[in-house]
Amino acid sequence: MSNSQEMLEALDQQDLTKADHYFQKALVEDPDDLLLELAYYLEGIGFYPQARQIYEKLAPIFPEVNLNLASIASEDGQIEEAFAYLEEIQPNSDSYVSALVLKADFYQMEGLTDVAREKLLEALNYSDDPLLIFGLAELDSELGNDLEAIKGYAQLDNREIYEQTGISTYQRIGTAYARLGKFESAIEFLEKALELEYDDQTAFELASLYFDQEEYQKAVLYFKQLDTISPDFEGYEYGYSQALHKEHQTEQALLIAQQGLEKNPFETRLLLLASQLSYELHQPEQAEAYLLQAQEDAEDQEEILLRLATMYQEQERYEDILALEVYDPENLLTKWMIARSYQETEDLDAAYESYQALVPELKENPEFLEQYIHLLRELGRFEEAKEQIQHYLKLVPDDIQMQELYERL
């Protein structure tokens, strides 16, 4: 039995000391071809230091092992050494194309996608391997060169590439067309991809595209397919619920939103949607509960505060509106509702202060001015009221009641 075989047997027995003993003997005594097989095996099971030691010994005889040395160096984070190994492979070598591809991989890992693309272009001068064309199209897609990417993918046999990579070129072409705003072409290729092989992401992209094109019935069809086949797919419930809502299936839309919240109870946009749907279904308590839940984790409170204030105003819950002031809202409508709530609760001085702060922003809004004028009358600030009425009448000159009020003041 060769030293290499003895080493492998020791590894099977998990006797690392014995394995190392035979490894050292193999380096000295075993023939090169047997050592090469041992190196391939050791690399495959993650024994990189030992594999690297063999490859370095054999590199003068088998220069192609510089590819393996480069891969191991890269795994160890030694990128400069990895490139140095690849430089040992010359253009007249059968391994040169593989070296260029590996260089492209390393450059892409380093974020130098443009340089990676140059290496694949160079490789195509030596080989017309479809996987090179595919790799170039992938890089073009990553770089945003969608037209170039489409040209590349279009050269390839979809089934052949799918069998080798698990990626559909039809799906890639459809996605690229979508980014270019060519939605009809995008849908055509995505549907073709889905016909040949079901894919969660493709179904989601189709559903989303149809929704964006306001073809809600078709969007619902693909979202439902996703919901049936792949209910664990991340994040489809929001779009599905929206599409159902557009189709006037509000109860079902709420159920789907709630289904999404079971997976992710803190997703703000789902909570806001569930609140809206609950309110439309005349479930104000549930609508409020969803908003309050969203408020706990939302980074941006403004929309939530506006919705809460609007709901409270419709229910004449003015004290609850005033309680929102502690969050220091920036939205003008929310601030306006707070000002009005001070007025409704007869805290007129606080109302006056709030209205005054809003005048610069809302002075062109007739409804705001009308409320402000009535407040000024209540406070006995008649000159200020007359001044605001004059401005109001410039905006609404045919308001007879306001003209009469001005004359009375």
State where each predicted segment sits.
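Alpha-helical segment of the N-proximal tetratricopeptide repeat
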Residues: S2-K25, E29, D33, E37-Q50, ...
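Short coil turns that delineate tetratricopeptide repeat
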Residues: E29-P31, P60-P63, D94, S127-D128, ...
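Start-of-helix register in tetratricopeptide repeats
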Residues: M1, D33-L36, E64-L67, V97-S98, ...
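Canonical tetratricopeptide repeat
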Residues: E37, N68-S71, L102, G135, ...
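Canonical positions in the second alpha-helix
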Residues: K25-A26, Y55-L58, E88-I89, E122-A123, ...
